[in-house]
């Protein structure tokens, strides 16, 4: 049902985001299909977004499939942005300080996609937003960074590189002082495995 639609994934609904989605639908001439965070602490998200065609409980497969098959994607979720990049979908993201603006800026700056972020209080789509994105330079940058990271790890593991605390301080420090995984940590690990399995299943379909 996502084909030919703007799909949104909104973690923190607000009046401004609601107006933005309606404006995007009007300007791009596409119907909306909306998804929200459905954790128990966010049970009122449906009411706060207050838009038709909002899924009450999207399954993992539906969530991924909607992003994969949509015409355009709008989100205030960092992980939503990540999957838009993986699936090479045209997207806009709404700055979300509640969820950590730094990682949004870091990723988008790295890929030279700063223009894909809207301010937190944006109520309207910028003029002349294209329905497509040229992912060739984005994918090239991603491949470069992945290759550099893989090379760094291989050198660190083989002893060719001195993997000191100064070189990757926080990562090493956390590794050295890591405690046995908590129940929450085990659940997160299981969730990542389920997400990976769902992703590969969607890709094969």
Give the location of each predicted region.
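Active-site anion-handling motifs in enzyme catalytic cores
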Residues: 1-205
